[in-house]
């Protein structure tokens, strides 16, 4: 039997998957403001740096818009 290496996922990747799923399921609609980083971190049980990286990736994907000093919007 041949074993495959175990893939380690990073916390921010899981955060990206969960937030993206909520957006695609329209739990967050275009124009909606996402909760603050601190609240997302608590809900996802990850640190704020993981949330920050997830939001950066989602922004690069075009799913969200990060407005400095104003929040993050779908």
Per-segment meaning from a language model:
Residues 1-74:
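Short linear motifs at protein or domain termini
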């Amino acid at each position: 039997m041949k074993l495959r290496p175990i893939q380690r996922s990073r916390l921010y990747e899981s955060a990206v998957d969960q937030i993206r799923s909520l957006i695609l399921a329209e739990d967050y609609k275009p124009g909606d403001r996402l909760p603050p980083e601190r609240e997302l971190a608590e809900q996802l049980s990850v640190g704020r740096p993981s949330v920050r990286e997830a939001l950066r990736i989602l922004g690069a994907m075009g799913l969200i818009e990060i407005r400095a000093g104003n929040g993050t919007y779908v």
